[in-house]
């Protein structure tokens, strides 16, 4: 009976991952360990409605994420958004994942501070907390101010201790992360100029990029 009542703790970290880099991976690992998640899924976006079109194909981005997390305990890849032929709205993904979990399982949506501050522009954003808790990755250099809608939401739903969030969904909390000044834009620019991205991406990802000649100026 005890196994039937066990609560699973699942996190999701979405992104274009164009390409996936050590900043994404370090954040994912730190959250998974700090929150003692059973699983943290990296979820590549197919056609993110709030971002520019990715530079390389969904198949390449998915392959790089899979290579990046291969053999890393607690991290996995969820490719459901790549199967859609329409913009990948987060609310649709949350509804889909929640339908696969038990009603008492905890689902955590992991967002960077800038993405969190932009939530009011997201499709059906007011419904997100019906399906998940939100974990905001906080950095000491964050300088974007949240809009009033989020200030009100934080006042009503924030939990000071992220590990104390109870129930399957409904709360917001903050997790401090190691600040790594790495961006996918920076990596693409390096590669386009013929420079190396070594130590900014995992070796397996760099090998994939080189084998498929991705992000070169001609691309």
UniProtKB/Swiss-Prot annotation:
The broad enzyme category this protein falls into is transferase
Q: Name one GO molecular function term.
A: nicotinate-nucleotide adenylyltransferase activity
Identify the EC number(s): 2.7.7.18
Q: Which reaction does it catalyse?
A: nicotinate beta-D-ribonucleotide + ATP + H(+) = deamido-NAD(+) + diphosphate
Reading the lineage from the top rank, the first entry is Bacteria
| Stored InterPro entries | Cyt_trans-like (IPR004821), NadD/NMNAT (IPR005248), Rossmann-like_a/b/a_fold (IPR014729)
- Give the residues annotated as coiled coil: none
Q: Which UniProt keywords apply?
A: ATP-binding, NAD, Nucleotide-binding, Nucleotidyltransferase, Pyridine nucleotide biosynthesis, Transferase
From the record, give the transmembrane residue ranges.
none
The role this protein plays is:
Catalyzes the reversible adenylation of nicotinate mononucleotide (NaMN) to nicotinic acid adenine dinucleotide (NaAD).
NCBIfam families per the record?
cyt_tran_rel (TIGR00125), nicotinate (nicotinamide) nucleotide adenylyltransferase (TIGR00482), PRK00071.1-1 (NF000839), PRK00071.1-3 (NF000840)
Q: What is this protein called?
A: Probable nicotinate-nucleotide adenylyltransferase
Organism encoding this protein: Pseudomonas entomophila (strain L48)
Chain's gene name: nadD
